[in-house]
UniProtKB/Swiss-Prot annotation:
InterPro entries: 2-oxoA_DH_lipoyl-BS, 2-oxoacid_DH_actylTfrase, 2-oxoacid_DH_E2_comp, Biotin_lipoyl, CAT-like_dom_sf, E3-bd_dom_sf, PSBD, Single_hybrid_motif. Its cofactor is (R)-lipoate. Residues 84-103, 117-126 have a biased composition (Basic and acidic residues). Binds 1 lipoyl cofactor covalently. PANTHER family: DIHYDROLIPOAMIDE ACETYLTRANSFERASE COMPONENT OF PYRUVATE DEHYDROGENASE COMPLEX (PTHR43178), LIPOAMIDE ACYLTRANSFERASE COMPONENT OF BRANCHED-CHAIN ALPHA-KETO ACID DEHYDROGENASE COMPLEX, MITOCHONDRIAL (PTHR43178:SF5). The active site is at residue 404. Residues 128-165 form the Peripheral subunit-binding (PSBD) domain. GO terms for cellular component: cytoplasm. Residues 2-77 form the Lipoyl-binding domain. This is Dihydrolipoyllysine-residue acetyltransferase component of pyruvate dehydrogenase complex. GO terms for molecular function: dihydrolipoyllysine-residue acetyltransferase activity; lipoic acid binding.
Amino acid sequence: MAFEFRLPDIGEGIHEGEIVKWFIKAGDTIEEDDVLAEVQNDKSVVEIPSPVSGTVEEVLVDEGTVAVVGDVIVKIDAPDAEEMQFKGHGDDEDSKKEEKEQESPVQEEASSTQSQEKTEVDESKTVKAMPSVRKYARENGVNIKAVNGSGKNGRITKEDIDAYLNGGSSEEGSNTSAASESTSSDVVNASATQALPEGDFPETTEKIPAMRKAIAKAMVNSKHTAPHVTLMDEIDVQELWDHRKKFKEIAAEQGTKLTFLPYVVKALVSALKKYPALNTSFNEEAGEVVHKHYWNIGIAADTDKGLLVPVVKHADRKSIFEISDEINELAVKARDGKLTSEEMKGATCTISNIGSAGGQWFTPVINHPEVAILGIGRIAQKPIVKDGEIVAAPVLALSLSFDHRQIDGATGQNAMNHIKRLLNNPELLLMEG
């Protein structure tokens, strides 16, 4: 009887996902832990490994189709496979039993280990492990996020759990895995630089990566849904420049890398409060406008895999230093591919910084269902008129795109003027921000 593999709960709050790519087809022979597919949810792409070895009988879900946790997505001829169930499908009773087991003496023996983990474990760490391994970790009182994986691509196995219980952390295995990843990456890079085909107009093709598909879908949806208007302006930021310079060393003393971006975040939040139409969502189908009484700012981040938008939540409650620290932490996570889906949810307005790439004015695309996005360009020395004289000053380029269904031109410009006023005199951020 064929083993029916169901889409598992991968432990990141994902209840459904789009099958963006299959790595197997009917007739393929696979080994346990081989990657079966890539699943997309929001902007996170997760590899789904096989829990068994065998032969693929049938792929039941096509690429581009959304599957729900518990749906059978592939059948595998695996005669020696044990009966397996996955979190999210038919294991409610097991979950209840596990909760009771966690109060047993076995758990008490591991309590001292767990107490140490709590102060050291990175709870935002992305874990690669099969549901059976996660269950095994729970049964043995192990926080799986404290375990280093020795499997393919850093995947955690039962042996890693055993090694952890015996006082090890599988670091050697993890290093081996990292080396393996590096080697495989070199192979991919080598293949990518293979000789071009012959002819006067050589062309090569590649499949669109899952991340690029997600970005393309979001951009097209935004442009097709919201009539965009973009206002472009600039502002003398000499006082902002001096203010950052004054507090840069103080920030560094407490481990904070102070940039101009946190000032822009605070100025934008102030504008959203003063002009709340920019902090809404426009639901034309339902005939509703959703007013958001919280201020979460998305920060568009350029990564090797594509555009990601981590979110600074409750930015109105945080200081310049706190926002700076959070932006830097999220940027590192974005570059390392360690952002969780939760860290990319809930933005009410977004900032796109093309200035970091040397750009100036542009037409940023709204991060739908938001209704506005603020683009910031580079700060450049320009001649300006001050007190009747032409002087050189650092000037910041700003671009504000908004959904014209919800925001009128005058409202958009008034919001832009408010942002300019605060950035021109950063002390006002303390008074009004």
